[in-house]
């Protein structure tokens, strides 16, 4: 089954006083009776460090087990592993870019 969460959404919200940050993904809009409703999944990060935000974004698409499986396949030069690894790396770069924009 293909994972439709291709990229994290760049919207983030830092919750002042709570030392938390929300990173939104799968953002969409829909019209209900003439009103636009915004929907999004999000992950909440307990600490406001750059690394915590990056890992939280990565986990919106890749569980730790899935990430380790991709790494293992790549290390063992399995067929199709390079493509999966490149996709993972691109997602990590996008996560890093989002975290950098937060100026944490």
What does each of the following model-derived ranges do?
Residues 2-104:
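A preference for well-ordered globular domain cores
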């Amino acid at each position: 089954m293909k994972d439709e969460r291709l990229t994290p959404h760049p919207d983030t919200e830092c919750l002042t006083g709570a030392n938390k940050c929300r990173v939104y993904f799968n953002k969409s809009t829909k019209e209900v009776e003439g009103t636009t409703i915004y929907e999004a999944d999000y992950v909440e990060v307990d600490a406001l460090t750059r690394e915590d935000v990056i890992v939280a974004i990565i986990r919106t698409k890749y569980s730790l087990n899935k990430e380790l499986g991709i790494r293992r396949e790549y290390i063992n030069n399995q067929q199709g592993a390079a493509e999966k690894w490149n996709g993972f790396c691109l997602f990590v770069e996008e996560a890093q870019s989002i975290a950098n924009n937060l100026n944490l």
